[in-house]
């Protein structure tokens, strides 16, 4: 993705990845022997009007049906899922809107979207219920007294802002 205003190129944006999850309804916990699953591109479609342009990526992803009985790895049996990614550029708006459409039939996993920025930043901004929250990128230092190790993922609803004076 290239920012035509700055010339900055973002490589590796919108990477769909799926990982196992053996945590509870509150906490993500990856299985000891996890496998990362990525989708395959099936087709692309574009729609263009005077106001916006949308690229639709139709993907398929083969997800393990669940974790194994021991819950330390993912099952070898998989289900194929359709997944659509819509990337929309609106005229005069300096951002790309990304929507992911996916109907889940698998258990014990987490589907995510990664956006590499290549930027060196100390914090990021996230939308909360009533405010824009600023959080440090680096995880806090831990020791043996921590019952639960911190994770880099944080709650957000509709956007994340990772930027500095170079772009974002």
Which ranges hold each PLM region?
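Polysaccharide-binding surfaces and accessory modules of carbohydrate-active proteins
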Residues: 115-168
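Acidic (Asp/Glu-rich), glycine- and aromatic
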Residues: 72, 92-135
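A general structural signal for short secondary-structure junctions and capping/turn motifs
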Residues: 44-48, 88-91, 103-105, 150-152, ...
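Catalytic and substrate-binding regions of extracellular carbohydrate-active enzymes
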Residues: 1-101, 113
């Amino acid at each position: 993705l290239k920012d035509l205003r700055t010339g900055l190129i973002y490589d590796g944006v919108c990477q769909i990845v799926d990982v196992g999850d053996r945590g509870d309804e509150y906490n993500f916990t990856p299985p000891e022997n996890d496998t990362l699953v990525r989708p395959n591109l099936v087709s692309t479609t574009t729609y263009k009007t005077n106001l916006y342009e949308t690229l639709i990526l139709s993907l398929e992803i083969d997800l393990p049906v669940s974790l194994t009985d021991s819950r330390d790895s993912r099952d070898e049996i998989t289900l194929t899922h359709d997944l659509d990614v819509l990337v929309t550029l609106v005229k005069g708006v300096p951002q790309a809107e990304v929507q992911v459409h996916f109907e889940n039939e698998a258990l014990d996993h987490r589907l995510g979207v990664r956006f590499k920025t290549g930027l060196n930043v100390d914090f990021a901004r996230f939308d909360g219920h009533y405010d824009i929250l600023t959080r440090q990128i680096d995880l806090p230092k831990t020791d043996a007294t921590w019952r639960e190790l911190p994770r880099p993922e944080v709650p957000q609803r509709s956007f994340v802002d990772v930027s500095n004076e170079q772009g974002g």
